[in-house]
Amino acid sequence: MSISIKDVARMAGVSPATVSRVFTNGPVSDDLRKKVEAAVKATGYRPNLSARRLRSQHSSTIGLIVSDIRNPFFTTLSRAVEDAAYRADMRVVLCNTDENPAREAMYLRLMQEERITGVIYAPTRATAATLGAMDFDFPIVLVDRAGPSGSQDVVGIDNAEAAGLLVDHLVAQGHRRIVGLFGNTSSTAVERHDGYAAAMARHGLATDAGFLAPAADAAEAELMRRLADGERPDAVMASNGLMLLGLYRGVRRAGLDTPRDIAVVGFDNESWTELVGSGLTVIEQPVAEIGRAAMDLLFERLRTPGMATRKVMLAGRLVVRGSSGARAA
C-alpha cells in the first residue's frame, strides 16, 4: 500500500499542511519539524517531487547541456558543475546533444517544462546565434561557446589568443606550412580559427585551414587525405582534444614521426597527450575552473536577475612537449 502525506501527518500528529511546509522548508517550529521527519522515516514516505515543483514554481535541479560527455573536456566540466551543485544541495540533469540543433531544442523545451532552476550550456553555433531572441523562465550560462555578443552570460578562455600561442610556438621552432583543422559546429572553433589566421598573417605565412566534424575519425581521415594527395605540412593543429587524437592516429598510421616528419599540436591537456611518443604540445584549459565559475555566475544570476550580462575569460596555458620540436633541416 502506498503511503500518502496524510499518513505521515496522522503519525506525526500534525496537519497535512504542516507536513507540506516541512518538505518545502516553510515556517515550522523545530519540534514539529522533528516529529514530521521521524514520521517520514518510520513510514518510508518519499515526497512527490513533481508536486513540490508545481507548488514552488521551480525545481532544485540544474540542467547541463553539452555536445558529448565522451569528450574529456565535458567530462571534467560536468564533474565540476555537479560538485558545485551538490554543495548547494541541488541536483544536475545531464543532456548530450551530439551537436544536433533539433536535439538541443528538445532539451531546452524539456528544461522549460520541468521548471529547471538554471542551465549550464555549450550550444552549437546555429543555436547560439538565436539564443538571445529566445524567452526562458530560467537563467542560462554558456560555457566554452559564446552566443551573440552580450546576449548571455558566458565562461571560457580567450580562444583566439590560445590558438595564436600555438602558431607562435610552431613558427619559433622553424615550422612554416602549418595546417589548422577546426570543428564545424561551434563558435569556439571559429574563434580558434580566427586566432590561427591572425597569427599566420602576423608572421607573413599563408593559411591552410579546414572545417570538419569535431571528431577523431574526421580529423584522421582529413590528414590521411592530405598525405595521399602529396601534401605533407610542417605542422598540423587540431582545435579540440578529440580531433587531436585523430591527428595523432593518422600520423602513426602513415608511419610518420613527430616532430621529425610532422609536428602535431592542439587543444586540451588530456592525460594521454603526455604518454604518447615524446608527448603532445597542447593548450591546457582550466576546465574545472570554468565549471566552477559557470556555477558561481549562475547562482549570482539567480540572486540578481537584472544584473548586466557577464563574460568571464580565463587563461589557457601553453604546455610544450616533444611533438612540436624544431623542424628537421
Which residues fall in each region the model found?
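Short beta-strand-centered segments that line the small-molecule binding cleft or hinge
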Residues: 105-161
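Bacterial carbohydrate/catabolite-sensing allosteric modules
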Residues: 42, 83-88, 136-142, 146-329
